[in-house]
Amino acid sequence: AGFSGLADFVFAMQGLGSGTISLFGSAEMQSKYLPDVRTGQKIAAFALTEPEAGSDAAALTTTAKIEDDFFVLDGEKTLISNGGIADYYTVFAKTGEAPGTRGISAFVVDADTPGVEITERIKVIAPHPLARIRFNKCRIPLAQQIGKGGEGFKMAMATLDIFRSTAAAASLGFARHALDEALERVKSRKMFGSPMSNLKLIQAKLGDMSLDIDASALLIYRAAWTKDNSAEKITREAAMAKLFATEAAPTCYRRSCTNFWWIRCGFRIRC
C-alpha cells in the first residue's frame, strides 16, 4: 500500500464491490461472482450513493419492484467507484417491506443487463473511475437479491465498516512510505557538517510522523481485532481508524516533502 495508489482500487474498491456478497450472499451467489473477482478477471462496484442520498443513505429513492419472476430496478446512483468498468454492481434499492432503512434490500446487477446505463463519467484524479449510473426498468431474476429483503441497509453498513478499516490500512501504508523516504534522506544528506538526522528539529519532525503512524496502526488493529472476535458492529472503531489514518497520511507526506524532499516533491513554476 505504501508504494501505489492501486491499493485504493484493489483493496478498497474491488473488495467493497464484492464485500456484501462475501458477508451475506448465498453459497451459490458467492461461487458465481467471487472467484473471478479474487483472480482479478472481473471488477466489482458498490452502488449505494445517489444524487440526493449521500451520508443519509436511508434517503435513497432507487426502487426494486417485483414483476412476475423478476425485480425491476428504477433509479440513479452517482459517484460510483469503478462505475463504467465494473462487470457487476452491488445495488441498494427500496423494496418497501417497512418504512425507512428497514425497507431497503441489496441486489447483484450484471453490468450488461438491459436497462443499466452509464450516464456520466465523472472526471477525477484517482486510480479508479467514478460514474453516474441509471437503472431504467432494469429486470433481474429474484435470485439476484442478496440475503433477505429489507436488510439491505444493515448489509451496506456492515460492509462499509470493514472497508473503512481497509481504507485506513492503505493510508497507513502511504504514511509509512513517507517516513521511510524521509529517513533515507536525513541519513544521507549532510547539513552543518553532519547528517540531517543529528539535528534536533529534524528528529522532532520525524517523531511527529512516527507518532501519527503508530497511532493509526493501533486504531486499525483494534478495529480488525474487534471484528475478528465476532463483534456484530465495529462502526465506532472503523470510523475512528479511517478518520485518523486518512488525515495522518497526507500530513506525513507533507512533512516528508516540505522538510526532506522538497526538490523531488515540488513543482517548478516559470513566471
At which residue positions do the language-model features occur?
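Flexible, small-/acidic-enriched active-site or ligand-binding loops
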Residues: A59, D112-P141
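A short, Trp-centered hydrophobic/proline-enriched beta-strand micro-motif
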Residues: G40-L48
